[in-house]
């Protein structure tokens, strides 16, 4: 898998860009909001990527952050959601608003995305809420507080920290959100839900 591209921006279209890396031009599908925020052609850009492999075509999708790519990949796991629809959701809502909508079970905000009807919105809610609860990482959550944010002490808190990191948040962002919770006696899933609500409201 091509994890990211760093190269010269050649062309910008409403929903795609061309990036030159090592003399090769890569056409990358991106949300319109990202395309509009990129610098002028000729400047260097950095995009996290996902390569979709089909029998008839290869398509690359680009994101400004690992957090957005994580949300895109989770959406791809929902039945009936393809890469272009997943990209539209991430581009229209943004990852933090998406997580907050899922936790509030707000299907209305999802149906504002072209191509997402009520049934698809409900399916996303059910499947992603379950995945958010079960998301795990294969790294230790007990990371040093080198950024000045206190390390969390409880087991549930560290499990929640690991889950938030696996969703694409930085250790600092995750610890800050968990440290802001008024109720720290929840289980790991409860802590994750509460922290996502805080970050989704920012």
Curated annotation (Swiss-Prot):
GO biological process, one term: DNA recombination
InterPro entries assigned to the protein according to its UniProt record, in alphabetical order: DNA_helicase_Holl-junc_RuvA_I, Hlx-hairpin-Hlx_DNA-bd_motif, NA-bd_OB-fold, RuvA, RuvA_2-like, RuvA_C, RuvA_C_sf
Gene Ontology cellular-component terms listed: cytoplasm; Holliday junction helicase complex; Holliday junction resolvase complex
GO MF, one example: four-way junction helicase activity
Region annotation (Flexible linker) ranges: 144-152
Keyword DNA repair belongs to the record: yes
Keyword Glycoprotein listed: no
Subunit structure: Homotetramer. Forms an RuvA(8)-RuvB(12)-Holliday junction (HJ) complex. HJ DNA is sandwiched between 2 RuvA tetramers; dsDNA enters through RuvA and exits via RuvB. An RuvB hexamer assembles on each DNA strand where it exits the tetramer. Each RuvB hexamer is contacted by two RuvA subunits (via domain III) on 2 adjacent RuvB subunits; this complex drives branch migration. In the full resolvosome a probable DNA-RuvA(4)-RuvB(12)-RuvC(2) complex forms which resolves the HJ.
Family stated for the protein in its record: Belongs to the RuvA family.
Domain description: Has three domains with a flexible linker between the domains II and III and assumes an 'L' shape. Domain III is highly mobile and contacts RuvB.
Name of the protein: Holliday junction branch migration complex subunit RuvA
Native organism: Desulforudis audaxviator (strain MP104C)
Upper lineage: Bacteria, Bacillati, Bacillota, Clostridia, Thermoanaerobacterales
């Amino acid at each position: 898998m091509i994890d990211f591209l760093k190269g010269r921006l050649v062309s910008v279209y409403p929903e795609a860009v061309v990036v030159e890396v090592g003399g090769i031009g890569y056409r990358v599908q991106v949300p319109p909001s990202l395309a509009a925020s990129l610098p002028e052609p000729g400047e260097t850009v950095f995009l996290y990527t996902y390569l979709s492999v089909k029998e008839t075509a290869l398509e690359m999708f680009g994101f400004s952050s690992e957090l957005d790519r994580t949300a895109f990949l989770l959406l791809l796991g929902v039945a009936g959601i393809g890469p272009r629809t997943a990209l539209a959701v991430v581009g229209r809502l943004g990852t933090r608003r998406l997580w907050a909508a899922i936790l509030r079970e707000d299907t209305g905000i999802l149906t504002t995305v072209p191509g997402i009807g009520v049934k698809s919105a409900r399916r996303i809610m059910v499947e992603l809420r379950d995945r958010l609860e079960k998301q795990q990482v294969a790294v230790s959550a007990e990371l040093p507080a080198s950024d000045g944010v206190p390390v969390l002490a409880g087991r549930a808190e560290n499990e929640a920290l690991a889950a938030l990191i696996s969703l694409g948040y930085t250790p600092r962002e995750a610890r800050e959100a968990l440290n802001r919770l008024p109720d720290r006696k929840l289980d790991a899933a409860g802590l994750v839900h509460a922290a996502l609500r805080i970050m989704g409201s920012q």
